[in-house]
Amino acid sequence: MKRIVLFWIPLLLLLLVNCTTESFDFGDQEGILVGGSGGGGSSQPNPTIPEGSEDLLGFTIAFDESDKTAYGSMSETVTSDDDFIENSQFASVVTIIYNGTTAAVSNGVSGVEVSSNGAHVVVNSTVSGVEYVLSGTTTNGSFKVYSEKKFKLSLAGVSILNPVGAAINIQSSKRVFVVCADETTNVLTDGSSYTATTDGEDMKACLFSEGQLIFSGGGSLTVTGNYKHAITSDDYVRFRSGCNITVASAKKDGIHTNESVIIGGGILNISSDGDAIQCEEGGITMTGGFAKLSTTDNKAHGLKSCLDVVISGGAIQAQVAGAASKGISCDGNLTISGGKLTAFTSQTALYEDNDLSSCAGIKCDGNILITGGEIAIQSTGGAGKGINCDGSITINDGTVKVITTGTQCVYGKLDSSAKGIKANGALTINGGT
């Protein structure tokens, strides 16, 4: 009996790959979406499923509501890394209490100067070991920092709306520990347009920093980016266990960095028009936590990395609604050794700039290595892909489920079909389910 089982397992895997990589038509889908000039796009009927093959698709794909608790509440091991606030001390405290159009400042720290114009507060600091504690509510205020040293920014039940700029603007290239005080609710909102800034200063998000942003604490933070991005660092952003960050909406990206994004724990709920999380020049690492990602624009991705993406733990739930959007878009290599990814794409392919681009749960320009974890992808739009890799794909372990149901898209001499798993290089399956 064992020999029979061992014989059928590789045969079943082979049938699954063959079945889901064809362009089977499960129903009428929309045609191609043209983003550039000209016409000529269409949807073409695809081959029908061979009799009996539908039995191979005896599974469904859905978001598991228990993932938020199971992965979001996981603890994180504290190391000697400078990103862990446990390795730093902040003995000096400056408090700012917002109240409508004013702000009350308590500052007894030598080397820290605080000025205010109504509820718009500006800090200039030349000393280390300072904690700034923000609380209260303003509908016309902000918090801006110039500092030569790393500092702690405690959000202790604060709500800041700045109708003409960023709610928090950190003009410092040093590390900032953003701590949401336990059992507090914090809200940051910017305006739909910004007034002119000081020459040479960047300001492109509701919460902006020139340096690293390290999020932690047991409270919650909700950010709305009405102008551009919700949270931006010109360096990197790290999310630690215990944090609870919501991007209610963003006109561009939810989280945008010049460098990398590290997700070690916590709960992220990001809704954006553009990419939910984008790294312009860095990679993305996820070892724990829960990230629910929702995007609406064409070519807007759940995770967008210009380098490698490495996932060893945590759970990602991505729903991308725009044409040619991806759950994960990786310019480098993708390695998945643990955790859980569930991704849904629903739109059709997009013709733009002489290129025909389709939706995909995963799109990787480099190589993909899967040694563990759970991957579940459903792509229902025209020419949608489950996993689309320009390099090679190697699956040694883990669970991979893919459902694609879109029609073929044709534009002139270009065409694209729905595929479960597509690799331009080698596709090697050594194990897994």
Predicted segments, located by residue:
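C-terminal motif of bacterial Sec signal peptides marking the signal peptidase cleavage site
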Residues: 15-18
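Positively charged n-region of N-terminal signal peptides that target proteins for export
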Residues: 1-6
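A composition-driven surface/loop motif
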Residues: 20-433
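Hydrophobic helical h-region of N-terminal Sec-dependent signal peptides
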Residues: 9-13
